[in-house]
């Protein structure tokens, strides 16, 4: 879930999702990819679409959307994580304020900014930049929304 209009984020995430499915021997289903805006109300509306799809889990790219999705599903009688699991991607403080708490991918946001600034400074100084793709360490914080 999240907007696909940003060519860098949306398309890269979708490509990574498709690659992970292929690596696991699973088939990609376009009907299980939901595009939405980054907001709590969008997450509430998303709950209806996700429930109707028959999906049993979601990876959401924004914590606010994930909270809306969680509340929308719980309000409609879905048991999380027993019947539906949710993982979000920013590990902001709101992931700990929900019931159940939201499992999250932990991203090194400070390091992301620092590395980006170093690369930008090198480019501005017309210095050589080796590889423009940097993969930083990340982790998974298991909480109550996943088994």
Identify the function of each model-found stretch:
Residues 1-147:
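Bacterial carbohydrate/catabolite-sensing allosteric modules
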């Amino acid at each position: 879930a999240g907007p696909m209009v940003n060519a860098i984020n949306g398309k890269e995430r979708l490509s990574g999702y498709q690659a992970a499915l292929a690596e696991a021997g699973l088939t990609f289903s376009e009907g299980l990819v939901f595009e939405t805006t980054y907001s709590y109300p969008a997450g509430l509306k998303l709950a209806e679409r996700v429930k109707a799809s028959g999906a049993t889990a979601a990876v959401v790219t924004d914590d606010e959307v994930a909270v809306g999705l969680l509340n929308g599903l719980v309000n409609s009688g879905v048991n999380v994580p027993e019947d539906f699991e949710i993982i979000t991607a920013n590990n902001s403080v709101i992931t700990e304020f929900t019931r159940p708490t939201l499992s999250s991918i932990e991203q090194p946001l400070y390091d992301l900014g620092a590395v980006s600034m170093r690369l930008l400074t090198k480019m501005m100084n017309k210095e050589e930049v080796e590889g423009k793709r940097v993969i930083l360490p990340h982790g998974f914080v298991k909480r109550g929304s996943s088994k």
